[in-house]
From Swiss-Prot:
Family of the protein in this entry: Belongs to the transient receptor (TC 1.A.4) family. STrpC subfamily. TRPC3 sub-subfamily.
Protein name: Short transient receptor potential channel 3
Record gene name: TRPC3
Effect of residue 847 to H: In SCA41; no effect on localization to the cell membrane; toxic gain of function effect
Illness the protein is tied to: Spinocerebellar ataxia 41: A form of spinocerebellar ataxia, a clinically and genetically heterogeneous group of cerebellar disorders. Patients show progressive incoordination of gait and often poor coordination of hands, speech and eye movements, due to degeneration of the cerebellum with variable involvement of the brainstem and spinal cord.
Subunit structure: Homotetramer. Interacts with ITPR1. Interacts with ITPR3. Interacts with MX1. Interacts with RNF24. Interacts with JPH2; the interaction is involved in maintaining Ca(2+) homeostasis in skeletal muscle and is mediated by JPH2 'Ser-165' phosphorylation.
Positions in the Cytoplasmic compartment: 1-459, 528-540, 631-649, 740-921
SMART domains cross-referenced by the UniProt entry: ANK (SM00248), TRP_2 (SM01420)
Length: 921
């Protein structure tokens, strides 16, 4: 007994009323005894049961889930079938008292039944035992006017001994409802007693829902003849999971009970279609109740071999359902967050690096051996958490400490160095990058190779390579910083017979280096696309930005190359057919003459013009790519996250903005399209001018005179003033301020949780460098290293072994076909011996399973301790009062028996004394 319980017992002062005299057996059955009226009290115009000696429910009582009774008007409903069966069995629907609001017909209880229900409700163990043993006419299934029988009353008031006595009777009704009631109130010992009843010997009792049980039994889970106490889809294990009863969930799992995962929301099977057609609301509620049970920490802890993986997958599934079933969006979001909190809670209980690694990496012993060999720290759970955006799990100190250790792998001394030393290392790597690449090509497995393969060095190398690429972009335009010497209307050539376009389309050495860098980055993106798959690749916005940037670069250089080819062909024509040395004195064909023109005469669709435009866009995207590495810094990381969230808000705002903008643009164009040349300026006379005027009006760069006409058409002009004014008020005052408010709200959300957001973004950046590969940055990655050839040959050699290993795994999982088994078992004796040893290993729990079992045990113990700390004294005080009440009846029974024995002794003594007195007389 805990210290809190002892204190409660010391503080408890229970005053018991005087024992009531037993009523005469011949009492009028139609009259309601005063004793029965004291058992009930009026509440808000109705009646509410009052259990002596306290009315409060114990702390931790789980309110029943949403419940609705069946439609009695429906022909062939379970309630009508149940009532028919009860009439056939001769069960009498009695009521406790004259109030008939809860029953269609009222039948008064006999005095014996009144006394029996009283004893069961108040825990009078001696009376219940005596009536069950001696009475021949007692109906143990008699009910009060609320429809509760003796078992339900005893369970509701936590009378364990009375419940055990009642469970010994045959044909006892509503045992399932009593079990659900005991689970909801947290009466573990009563739950255990009910589960030991022969009625639960069949496992189907615990796996089928009450609505399915109604098709087989009359009232096993029923509260009364009108339906169940809880929702018809609530099974005992679902209710126990809802109420977070770990002991009860464990008992039910040992009995074979499981929560069936609902079908996919878009499932078209016959069962789902029938439920959706019959009652869509009930079907949706049943799905929510099932997911509440599946997402319960009690069920996740005790039912899954890998609770962390199960919780992560379930959180993602619930998040998707929140976006699908909008009407239950908040419910599904809470359940998804509950699963995420469970994972964080388990991670928080780790005590050493081995346990942290087990959670972050998953079960490495069940993974492919080649994958484990290639990288011991797979971090599969961290990758999954990042994919499902479980930010608190990734940003947890235990996870961050482990990631930081891997980040400085093979560079343990650098972790404790100052910022100045780290910056010096970055500078050295940037300057010596070509030499480091050569050293890695020659000796990839040397000390230098191991250092370059560390995530930090890979990050520094890639960042330095990209900085060099940006430097090339700037240097390529440095000759035009102070202006150009060749004006757009001037042509300059190296020799008289040279075509001007040949000079302008030639590639410089910086442009060639830029193209090499672009090819290297494109090769890296192709490898990443191959490894991750198209879907995972596109889901990462930085990959989309990289792909777009590189595509524009390639398009720009392609257009530039086409222009160079055309100019070269023109030059070849001139060299072959023109004899004069000065082209200005020669008449050339139009298609050749075009390439001698100055820039001001080029066509708008000229490939070189298109190339220059695309190149400018690609340069802008290249510099914006710097934001990718900003999360590595604690100061700039939150700013980059806020910028990304702001861009999302702008895209959302653009929908409303475009709608309003397009409406006024078309309206103003229709109004002024007839006045081309009759306005002060050309605003709104064409669609293009209308777009320009309204767009720059947002920034205050349009004039009010844009709506003024030269003619005296005041009506049109006034309408223009009104529409233009409404547009400015709507766009500038309303929508722009709304956008500012949205951006401010998003920034505040990031700022309030900046540490978690930054660590989550930094972890995503780190993980991109944790996997093997991408050691050398572009453009050095274009040259394959000797290690790549060795790995390629090893894959070819090990391909048959990998195939046999997959076949062995399929057979062990019961998935291999007969042909696969035949091919496998015809291998050498050594292979057979290895398979036998592998099977023997499978029979033993893996190291991961042992660690997970230890962590889950801590989690359950912590949950139970937290629950005990949260409980108030009222619940424990009521339990003490109930025990004292039962003890009172036992003492009264002992007193009654002692009185009877004393009366018998006095009678015997008087019989012996009377003859002696007569003889004396």
């Amino acid at each position: 007994m805990s210290t809190k319980v002892r204190k409660c017992k010391e503080q408890a002062r229970v005053t018991f009323p005087a024992p009531e005299e037993e009523e005469d057996e011949g009492e009028d059955e139609g009259a309601e005894p005063q004793r029965r009226r004291r058992g009930w009290r009026g509440v808000n115009g109705g009646l509410e049961p009052r259990s002596a000696p306290s009315q409060r429910e114990p702390h931790g009582y789980c309110p029943p889930p949403f419940s609705h009774g069946p439609d009695l008007s429906m022909e062939g409903s379970p309630s009508l079938r149940r009532m028919t069966v009860m009439r056939e069995k001769g069960r009498r629907q009695a009521v406790r008292g004259p109030a008939f609001m809860f029953n269609d017909r009222g039948t008064s209880l006999t005095a014996e039944e009144e006394r029996f229900l009283d004893a069961a409700e108040y825990g009078n163990i001696p009376v219940v035992r005596k009536m069950l043993e001696e009475s021949k006419t007692l109906n143990v299934n008699c009910v009060d006017y609320m429809g509760q029988n003796a078992l339900q009353l005893a369970v509701g008031n936590e009378h364990l001994e009375v419940t055990e006595l009642l469970l010994k009777k045959e044909n006892l009704a509503r045992i399932g409802d009593a079990l659900l009631l005991a689970i909801s109130k947290g009466y573990v010992r009563i739950v255990e007693a009910i589960l030991n009843h022969p009625g639960f010997a069949a496992s189907k009792r615990l796996t089928l829902s009450p609505c399915e049980q109604e098709l087989q039994d009359d009232d096993f889970y029923a509260y009364d003849e009108d339906g169940t106490r809880f929702s018809p889809d609530i099974t005992p294990i679902i209710l126990a999971a809802h109420c977070q009863k770990y002991e009860v969930v464990h008992m039910l799992l040992m009995k074979g009970a499981r929560i069936e995962r609902p079908h996919d929301y878009f499932c078209k099977c016959g069962d789902c279609m029938e439920k959706q057609r019959h009652d869509s609301f009930s079907h949706s509620r049943s799905r929510i109740n099932a997911y509440k049970g599946l997402a319960s920490p009690a069920y996740l802890s005790l039912s899954s071999e890998d609770p962390v993986l199960t919780a992560l997958e379930l959180s993602n599934e619930l998040a998707k359902l929140a976006n699908i079933e909008k009407e239950f969006k908040n419910d599904y979001r809470k359940l998804s967050m509950q699963c995420k909190d469970f994972v964080v809670g388990v991670l928080d209980l780790c005590r050493d690096s081995e346990e942290v690694e087990a959670i972050l990496n998953g079960d490495l012993e069940s993974a492919e051996p080649l994958e484990v060999h290639r990288h011991k720290a797979s971090l599969s759970r961290v990758k999954l958490a990042i994919k499902y955006e479980v930010k608190k799990f990734v940003a947890h100190p235990n996870c961050q400490q482990q990631l930081l250790t891997i980040w400085y792998e093979n560079l343990s001394g650098l972790r404790e160095q100052t910022i100045a030393i780290k910056c010096l290392v970055v500078l050295v790597v940037a300057l010596g990058l070509p030499f480091l690449a050569i050293g890695y090509w020659i000796a990839p497995c040397s000390r230098l190779g191991k250092i370059l393969r560390s995530p930090f060095m890979k990050f520094v190398a890639h960042a330095a390579s990209f900085i060099i690429f940006l430097g090339l972009l700037v240097f390529n335009a440095s000759d035009r910083f102070e202006g150009i010497t060749t004006l757009p209307n001037i042509t300059v050539t190296d020799y008289p017979k040279q075509i001007f376009r040949v000079k302008t389309t030639q590639f410089t050495w910086t442009e060639m280096l830029i193209m090499v860098w672009v090819l290297g980055m494109m090769w890296s993106e192709c490898k990443e696309l191959w490894l991750e798959g198209p879907r995972e690749y596109i889901l990462q916005l930085w990959n989309v930005l990289d792909f777009g940037m590189l595509s524009i670069f390639i398009a720009a250089f392609t257009a530039r190359f086409l222009a160079f080819l055309q100019a070269t062909k023109a030059q070849q024509y001139v060299d072959s057919y023109v004899q004069e040395s000065d082209l200005s004195e020669v008449t050339l064909p139009p298609e050749i003459q075009y390439f001698t023109y100055a820039r001001d005469k080029w066509l708008p669709s000229d490939p070189q013009i298109i190339s220059e435009g695309l190149y400018a866009i690609a340069v802008v995207l290249s510099f914006s790519r710097i934001a990718y590495i900003l999360p590595a810094n604690e100061s700039f990381g939150p700013l980059q996250i806020s910028l990304g969230r702001t861009v999302k808000d702008i895209f959302k705002f653009m929908v409303l903005f475009i709608m309003v903008f397009f409406a006024f643009m078309i309206g103003m164009f229709i109004l002024y399209s007839y006045y081309l040349g009759a306005k002060v300026n050309a605003a709104f006379t064409t669609v293009e001018e209308s777009f320009k005027t309204l767009f720059w009006s947002i920034f205050g760069l349009s004039e009010v005179t844009s709506v003024v006409l030269k003619y005296d058409h005041k009506f049109i002009e006034n309408i223009g003033y009104v529409l233009y004014g409404i547009y400015n008020v709507t766009m500038v005052v309303v929508l722009l301020n709304m956008l500012i408010a949205m951006i401010n709200s998003s920034y505040q959300e990031i700022e309030d949780d900046s540490d978690v957001e930054w660590k989550f973004a930094r972890s995503k950046l780190w993980l991109s460098y944790f996997d093997d590969g991408k050691t050398l940055p572009p453009p050095f990655s274009l040259v394959p290293s000797p290690k790549s050839f060795v790995y390629f040959i090893m894959r070819i050699v090990n391909f048959p072994k990998c195939r046999r290993r997959r076949l062995q795994k399929d057979i062990e999982m019961g998935m291999g076909n007969s042909k696969s088994r035949l091919n496998l078992f015809t291998q050498s004796n050594s292979r057979v011996f290895e398979s036998h040893s592998f099977n023997s290993i499978l029979n033993q729990p893996t190291r991961y399973q042992q660690i997970m079992k230890r962590l889950i045990k801590r989690y359950v113990l912590k949950a139970q301790v937290d629950k005990e700390n949260d409980e108030v004294n009222e619940g424990e005080l009521k339990e003490i009062k109930q025990d004292i009440s039962s003890l009172r009846y036992e003492l009264l029974e002992d007193k009654s028996q002692a009185t009877e024995e004393l009366a018998i002794l006095i009678h015997k003594l008087s019989e012996k004394l009377n003859p002696s007195m007569l003889r004396c007389e």
